[in-house]
A protein has these predicted regions:
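Zn2+-dependent cytidine deaminase-like catalytic core
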Residues: 1-21, 106, 187-189
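Flexible, polar/acidic helix-loop-strand segments at domain edges
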Residues: 25-37
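Enzymes that bind and transform nitrogen-containing heteroaromatic metabolites
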Residues: 20, 32, 39-223
């Protein structure tokens, strides 16, 4: 109707200019509105031989300054950063924006049984809101001094990635950056819900490594 009004007023109107560019700029909002799910970005660091780490109990740095700065830029551009219980326990991260300018994203942890200790940084630093996704079979939505607990449906005794994303969308979250470990990453890949992937590859191999990067890029993915 707006175009019609302008044309009747004698104003020349061009429709569809830079349409694809506009879609890319608004991709997270468009998906949130049309599908009820956030735009999902996965970030993973790997060794030259494709391993994310030694094992699930050990934290190891694989990236350099440039890739870390890019990771913080990604954090500054999304509504929320998502990790799993194991990453929260081992790294005790804050998931804040550093090295670049930007606001801290919301922090989301997938913790099926709500067993994470409330002494973690994510529950105490007050730098951003923290959400814990837990099983809807055992818990109800609860807001506490430390975080907001959001119940999510289970599939095969694990939280459903699709329902997790729909739950976050209802909280107004339109974009999510996954920084979780192998298990979280694999579950979201298998659910087919990842829209964009960034892989940082270190110029070294890991001896005796067990955590293989689950991402196997098909021809559908552009590099």
């Amino acid at each position: 109707k707006g175009v019609e009004v302008l044309e009747k007023a004698g104003i020349m109107v061009h429709v569809g200019i830079l349409e694809e560019e506009a879609k890319r700029l608004n991709q997270s909002f468009n998906k949130w509105i049309t599908q009820g799910m956030p735009w999902v970005i996965a970030k993973v660091a790997q060794s030259a031989d494709g391993y994310m780490g030694i094992n699930s109990e050990t934290s190891i740095w694989l990236t350099g300054e440039v890739s870390r700065s890019h990771a913080h830029t990604l954090r500054s551009e999304v509504d929320a950063v998502l990790i799993g219980r194991q990453t929260a326990l081992i790294d005790d991260p804050s998931l804040t924006v550093r090295e670049v300018h930007g606001e801290n994203p919301k922090r989301v942890i997938m913790d099926t049984n709500r067993t994470l200790p409330l002494t973690l940084n994510l529950f105490n630093d007050k730098k951003a809101d923290t959400y814990v996704l837990c099983s809807d079979q055992r818990f109800t939505q609860t807001q506490t001094h430390f975080c907001n607990y959001l119940p999510v449906k289970e599939e095969n005794k694990k939280l459903s990635p699709i329902h997790a994303l729909k739950t976050l969308a209802k909280e107004g979250i339109s974009s999510v950056l996954i920084e979780g470990g192998q298990e979280i990453l694999k579950s979201f890949i298998e659910a087919g819900v990842i829209d964009q992937i960034f892989i940082y590859t270190a110029p070294k191999k890991l001896d005796d490594a067990q955590l293989k990067n689950p991402i196997q890029l098909s021809e559908e993915w552009s590099v």
